[in-house]
Amino acid sequence: LGYFLLVAVAAWFVLAIFVKEVKPGVRRATEGTLIDTATLLAELARPDLLSGDPTHGQLAQAFNQLQHRPFRANIGGINKVRNEYHVYMTDAQGKVLFDSANKAVGQDYSRWNDVWLTLRGQYGARSTLQNPADPESSVMYVAAPIMDGSRLIGVLSVGKPNAAMAPVIKRSERRILWASAIL
């Protein structure tokens, strides 16, 4: 009996660790895809920024078309029906020149960590509440520099609501708990 109790307690601790690691693990994986996406979009956005009119550039046109393009994807039992990325581009001073949500153009984002750190040659990321009264409304942003040769000319930041990851996290936690119940 003592052996089974010891095994049960050990299994409970292992299970608790697994469940606690699901959320940060999913967020770390998402952060990795955000930096890849930001870096790619920064390269694609360079001509838009150099043109002096990024609000009418290829990136802006692509996001405009994306908003009107329906899509459906069933990803492991989780339905996805819209783009969840929020993308904005700043100049080298941190002034927003393009915003996929059309809310921040002209604003100074130079003090936001994602922009501030990227403008200083560092890895720039932040998590911000969309609604200060709702702790579940956080959005993770990761930024990449927009370069013209060796000169930093701007920052492109990609954000994704943490709530968009909630179904994956909840499903993973349920599966771990269900599997442990079988054991």
Which functions belong to the PLM regions below?
Residues 1-19, 181-182:
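Extreme N-terminal signal-anchor transmembrane helix of membrane signaling/transducer proteins, especially
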Residues 2, 27, 170-182:
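Internal alpha-helical transmembrane segments of multi-pass membrane proteins, especially GPCRs
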Residues 17-45, 172-175:
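Juxtamembrane membrane-water interface segments immediately C-terminal to a transmembrane helix
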Residues 56-74, 84, 95, 99-136:
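Extracytoplasmic/periplasmic sensor domains and loops in membrane signaling proteins
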Residues 132, 147-149, 157-176:
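Helix-start (N-cap) segments at beta->loop->alpha junctions
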Residues 135-145:
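A short beta-strand signature within small-molecule sensing/ligand-binding domains used
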